[in-house]
Curated annotation (Swiss-Prot):
Originating species: Avena sativa (Oat)
Purpose of the protein: Molecular chaperone; assists the folding of proteins upon ATP hydrolysis. Known to play a role, in vitro, in the folding of actin and tubulin.
Protein known as: T-complex protein 1 subunit epsilon
Molecular function per GO: ATP binding; ATP hydrolysis activity; ATP-dependent protein folding chaperone; unfolded protein binding
Compartment(s) of residence: Cytoplasm
Keywords from the UniProt entry: ATP-binding, Chaperone, Cytoplasm, Nucleotide-binding
Length: 535
């Protein structure tokens, strides 16, 4: 216990547990929080844009990941600071809602914090800064709506969707194949989309990968690929017009659930037991054949004796198939999952035009292709690549492209990329600042400056002089009244993003601004940080 005095020299007692806690208050707390947020943004800043750098992250158990996906980088980083964890959550929210723009949203939040720090040092109250930021974000979101363009597409004319997905893939390690991968992503989304209701269920798209081959061998399969093979090497490798029994129950004689033992003291008794088990399993196989099944896919395993019997009775089977894959197979083939063997019937069988086993490489890795299904609303993107890291990064890139295509189907408004939308919003917010009397005007101007962080980072990562490039593009915006001018990252020779076909979804860009503002407001309102001491 200790005695201390407050600012009016009134004595108060500190309990021993409280003595052990460290505490930051007022401006010190806000500066510490801002510094933590800025440090996270600084890490991601170099990964922004088509010329952004990748990060290599090693997990405690030695797994190595190479990526430039903002959400993945922050997910794998070992972050202790609570404010830094907020930035990780921010990136995760953007990934969950939109799927793309996870790096940009953190860079923008870091820039907003940097500008807020300058205002706090000038004595402006954090609440006034937060209110100014809120006003500015509304102005920016409304301005994005006004400069957006409706992008018309149909099931036959998919070029607008492909171009927007290509913009997303430009910043990824797979950018050399961006056209092919964008087309695959768009076709996959359209296969599972309900265009009338503007609804897309991405769970119906399975992304599978296999080491070997090259990235260009990546394909879209109208059906399901399962990383399994037939349970017996002598079973047929190709089944046409397959009727599939999908079982989640054990495909073997039942075992008593209570504690039991069987005394066998003669050879005859053992043979009787074995014969009984064989007969029971024979009846199960016969029931499958009676209902018309030509292939059994089972969630559980069965022993080698059962496997041999299946081969003898000419009933191909696949064992140890995961629950998620079983669901997709059921959706694709129009079958029903059978939880109890007694419930198996002809109506519950799935139908597929072709089931084939395909071999890969010299090691004879095999996978099962279920194609020409009764219901085509379940597809698989099958990725090939030189190593596991490449395949994992391609999966992340494909996920972003799928999300962008989904967002365009839900809302077909686009804005132009390359930092053009941020520059246009910055000019609009700057112009609107004069209409707001009071201290908030400073915060609105600071918000406009913070929006410039995205084009500055794009220019810097592309090896261009950032400030010179930004001022030239800004003057172009004002002189020509052209909101399509952005940073020419690829040195094409024009900074008109319409000519370069660089597009981003409107809802993705609006969400970026709103989420970043929300988190920054939350951080600015923290004026007291109490943490337990380390000893």
């Amino acid at each position: 216990m200790a005695l201390d005095f407050d600012e009016y020299w009134r004595p108060f007692i500190i309990l021993r547990e409280q003595e052990k806690k460290s505490r930051l208050q007022g401006l010190d707390a806000q500066k510490a929080n801002i510094a933590a947020g800025k440090s996270v943004a600084r890490i991601l800043r170099t990964s922004l844009g088509p010329k952004g750098m990748d990060k290599m992250l090693q997990s405690p158990d030695g797994d190595v990941t190479i990526t430039n996906d903002g959400a993945t980088i922050l997910e794998l980083m070992d972050v202790d600071n609570q404010i830094a964890k907020l930035m990780v959550e921010l990136s995760r929210s953007q990934d969950y809602d939109i799927g793309d723009g996870t790096t940009g949203v953190v860079v923008m939040a870091g820039s907003l914090l940097e500008q807020a720090e300058k205002l706090l040092e000038r004595g402006i109250h954090p609440i006034r800064v937060a209110e100014g930021y809120e006003m500015a974000s509304r102005i920016a979101v409304d301005h994005l709506e006004s400069i957006s363009t409706k992008y018309e597409f149909s099931a036959t004319d998919i070029e607008p969707l492909v171009q927007t997905c290509m913009t997303t893939l430009s910043s990824k390690i797979v950018s050399r194949c961006k056209r092919a991968l964008a087309e695959i992503a768009v076709k996959a989304v359209l296969a599972v989309a309900d265009l009338e209701r503007k609804d897309v269920n991405l769970d119906l798209i399975k992304v599978e990968g296999k080491v070997g081959g090259k990235l260009e061998d990546t394909e879209l399969v109208q059906g399901i690929i399962v990383d399994k093979d037939m349970s017996h090497p002598q079973m047929p490798k190709r089944i046409e017009d397959a009727h599939i029994a999908i079982l989640t129950c054990p495909f073997e004689p039942p075992k008593p659930k209570t504690k039991h033992k069987v005394d066998i003291d003669t050879v005859e008794k053992f043979q009787t037991l074995r014969g009984q088990e064989q007969k029971y399993f024979d009846e199960m196989v016969q029931k499958c054949k009676d209902v018309g099944a030509t292939l059994v896919i089972c969630q559980w395993g069965f022993d080698d004796e059962a496997n041999h019997l299946l081969m003898q009775r000419e009933l191909p089977a696949v064992r140890w198939v995961g629950g998620v894959e079983l669901e997709l197979i059921a959706i694709a083939t129009g079958g029903r999952i059978v939880p109890r063997f007694q419930e198996l019937s002809t109506e519950k069988l799935g139908k597929a035009g072709l089931v084939r086993e395909k071999s890969f490489g010299t090691t004879k890795d095999r996978m099962l292709y279920i194609e020409k299904c009764a219901n085509s609303k379940a597809v698989t993107i099958f990725i090939r690549g030189g190593n596991k890291m490449m395949i994992e990064e391609t999966k992340r890139s494909i996920h972003d492209a799928l999300c962008v295509a989904r967002n365009l189907i839900i809302n077909n408004s686009i804005v132009y990329g390359g930092g053009s939308a941020e520059i246009s919003c910055s000019i609009a917010v700057e112009a609107a600042a004069d209409r707001h009397p009071g201290v908030e005007q400073y915060a609105i101007r600071a918000f406009a400056d913070a929006l410039d962080a995205i084009p500055l980072a794009l220019a810097e990562n592309s090896g261009l002089p950032p400030i010179d490039t930004l001022t030239v593009v800004k003057s172009q915006h004002v002189k020509e009244n052209n909101s399509r001018c952005g940073i020419d990252c690829n040195d094409v020779g024009t900074n008109d993003m319409k000519e370069q076909n660089v597009f981003e979804t409107l809802i993705g860009k609006q969400q970026q601004i709103l989420l970043a503002t929300q988190v920054v407001k939350m951080i600015l309102k923290i004026d007291d940080v109490i943490t337990p001491s380390e000893y």
